[in-house]
Amino acid sequence: MPITPFHIIAGFAVKSIFNKHFSWSIFALTNIIIDVEVIYYIFTIGEASHKFFHTLIGSSIIAFSCAIIGIPICERALKFWNNNLQNEKSLAKLKWLSTESDISVVSSFTGAFVGAYSHILLDSFMHFDVKPFEPFFSKTFVGIISIDSLHLSLVGLFIFGLIVYLFRKFR
């Protein structure tokens, strides 16, 4: 499934621990951009195909690009998000969802590269055609962990991240 939410929610645990040093919005952007290739193949050949962007070389190029280009894009999106939460028509109960809109270069690169490498690692457990180390060798990790166990682990990471986030936000 392209742009699976499981990739993105797993990053929430990293964000909750490394708050200022990790951009979750850049992490999410990187995950989405990596799957643009899969969406392209769905529309052109009629099936999901994981190719160049799902290798270390391809995902590194995407991560570097997202780390640079993503800062102004994500900062603008976060400012829009925060402004809408501060809107007088917004429910006061939702204002706690506002977040820091400034993204440092360090947090951008951390979010982008953790996003890219975790994406191809997770996909290599689920899809036979993901070979992260190509063109050097064609190793896949399918079967090491069941997809159900993988999904449960990612949901568990999200719940852990949510607990840490809420604890830090309201202490």
Name each model feature, range by range.
Residues 1-171:
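N-terminal membrane-targeting hydrophobic helices
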